Amino acid sequence: ANYFDVEAVSNSIKPGAYARLPYTSKVLAENLVRRATEDQKSIGLKQILNSENSQDFPWYPARVVCHDILGQTALVDLAGLREAIAAQGGNPSNVNPVVPTQLIVDLSLAVEHGGHEPDARLKNQEIEQRRNDDRFHFIEWTKKAFQNVDVVPPGNGIMHQINLERMSPVIHKVNGIAYPDTCLLY
């Protein structure tokens, strides 16, 4: 795979500075070199290399990980936008998240049956399904309707555990270019 030589670009601005950067700053610098306009790149890299924070610069996450409640709200907005575009004669299937979005359905299980009861977990999951049927139906629809949306169903763990243990690729490779994983937890 190919990659952007962030060290060379950084050292052309401030020789030797890249080697002294913390890892997180190197990831931000790579993101700027790969994605930003020349002006944004220049402003952002100078700030990173000089440990300054006088101006904002763009950051483009490789993916977004959403808790189901917050992510569902965003997907409802996208569904509404699709309806409006269709009403105007446009193609609603053109409305999709720009970056891969992972919706994790977690933390909605209410405990009605205790661990001493046979099949307590199964009974609690059945109650959860019944109480949240409309919500789960919408979430399942979004998985099929939108490109760039992946859904992790309930019962698989909490958001941070799932992200760290199962979802983070550490390095992405798209169109022959390798770059570090960056994630916005929403």
Where in this protein do the model-derived segments appear?
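Fe-S-dependent hydro-lyases/dehydratases of central metabolism
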Residues: A1-Y186
